[in-house]
Curated annotation (Swiss-Prot):
Entry's transmembrane regions: 16-32
Organism: Bos taurus (Bovine)
Disulfide bridge partners, by residue number: none
Cellular location(s): Mitochondrion inner membrane
Coiled coil start-end: none
Assembly notes: Interacts with LETM1.
Gene Ontology MF, one: ATP hydrolysis activity
Protein known as: Mitochondrial chaperone BCS1
């Protein structure tokens, strides 16, 4: 059969015509779909702008807070609960709603912005055990200014929430994370230490903060270490908290007794501590004892953690130690500390914070009962010291709480503090 006749036969065949038509339609649809995909990709690439913020970024928490303010109409929410136990023992909780994982749309500065909060269930943060998260902003146009404005606004909102408050950080894995909500700043004069102690520390630390060039010009490492020692309940930690508020610094809490703390992790944490922060190492005597005691009974004093004493010394002032850092250490037993730990260079200033003196008792009475005559405050101090000379500010404060509005009763029953 000639080729022309074969072609005519196929043309006249209805089954072939229908099949060819289906193939043509399918091919056209496939090409249209592929073209639409390529067109969408090209449109997103040239006419849309995207910003992805991973959960590890500092601005992630700011942006979630910002989204809570700007997505009040969203119906898909997640809850973040904060549990806080106050020093008085009272327990309070705070609930904050944030947009849940998924897509959300907000109207901002004349633009619709698509916000996608994604959660990767296959990827888990090994430090917290939570799924890996990120938030992605998508907007029409190519101007990045809208994202800068969002980040600036989120940052300002975070600063407003922290204004007048002290931010606490705790070590989680290899990074510092905020510990609860910022706490209201405690006035420095609310912690009454022995006369002159507060003034000496504040004067020294302000001189250190204000003169970085002096250290640099002389080749002296720009870091400062302080040790507060004395009986428990005398105000060491309270003073550091109040001092941080006075300096408008945050506090980084680090426990040396943490069994997961190693030499490398300690060195890394000290090197990445937030700027304008005080690093607080509480009860260092509980983490390390004098090497003389360890030599007497090595089994008894064998450490349970991975942190070594030499690792701590190197982190404080070794070759790899960081600068522009302020470290506070506290201890109830300075005699248990190795001399190498508290030598100059690692501890530049030591202050004893002990039991109440007559001056302290007088000042505390006048602070709790403003407007009362100085003679009444001195009478109270004399009666307390006649009963006992070993009384801490924490005990006195607890005693005043029993006589909130009764200074006469506080004086009359001052002898009960001996119990």
């Amino acid at each position: 059969m000639p080729l022309s006749d074969f072609v005519l036969a196929l043309k006249d065949n209805p089954y072939f015509g229908a099949g060819f038509g289906l193939v043509g339609v399918g091919t056209a649809l496939a090409l249209a779909r592929k073209g639409a995909q390529l067109g969408l990709v090209a449109f997103r690439r040239h006419y849309m702008i995207t910003l992805e913020v991973p959960a590890r970024d500092r601005s992630y928490a700011w942006l979630l807070s910002w989204l809570t303010r700007h997505s009040t109409r969203t119906q898909h929410l997640s809850v973040e609960t904060t549990y806080l136990q106050h020093e008085s023992g009272r327990i309070s909780t705070k609930f904050e709603f944030v947009p849940s994982p998924g897509n959300h749309f907000i109207w901002y500065q004349g633009k619709w912005i698509r916000v996608e909060r994604s959660r990767e269930m296959q990827m888990i943060d090994l430090q917290t055990g939570t799924p890996w998260e990120s938030v992605t902003f998508t907007a029409l146009g190519t101007d990045r200014k809208v994202f800068f404005n969002i980040l600036e606004e989120a940052r300002e909102l975070a600063l407003q929430q922290e204004e007048g408050k002290t931010v606490m950080y705790t070590a989680v894995g290899s990074e510092w994370r905020p510990f609860g909500y910022p706490r209201r700043r405690r006035p420095l004069n609310s912690v009454v230490l022995e006369q002159g102690v507060t003034e000496r520390i504040v004067r020294d630390i302000r001189e250190f903060i204000d003169n970085p060039k002096w250290y640099i010009d002389r080749g002296i490492p720009y870091r400062r270490g302080y040790l507060l020692y004395g009986p428990p309940g005398c105000g060491k930690s309270s003073f550091i908290t109040a001092l941080a508020g006075e300096l408008q610094h945050s506090i980084c809490l680090l426990s040396l007794t943490d069994s997961s703390l190693s030499d490398d992790r300690l060195n890394h944490l000290l090197s990445v501590a937030p700027q304008q922060s005080l690093v607080l190492l509480e009860d260092v005597d509980a983490a390390f004892l004098s090497r003389d005691l360890a030599a007497e009974n090595p089994i008894k004093y064998q450490g349970l953690g991975r942190l070594t004493f030499s690792g701590l010394l190197n982190a404080l002032d070794g070759v790899a130690s960081t600068e522009a850092r302020i470290v506070f250490m506290t201890t109830n037993h300075i005699d248990r500390l190795d001399p190498a730990l508290i030598r100059p260079g690692r501890v530049d200033m030591k202050e004893y914070v002990g039991h109440c003196s007559r001056w302290q008792l007088t000042q505390m009475f006048q602070r709790f009962y403003p407007g009362q005559a100085t003679s009444l405050a001195e009478n109270f101090a004399d009666r307390v010291l006649q009963a006992t000379t070993q009384i801490s500010p924490a005990q006195v404060q607890g005693y005043f709480m029993l006589y909130k509005n009764d200074p006469a009763g506080a004086i009359q029953n001052a002898e009960s503090l001996r119990r």
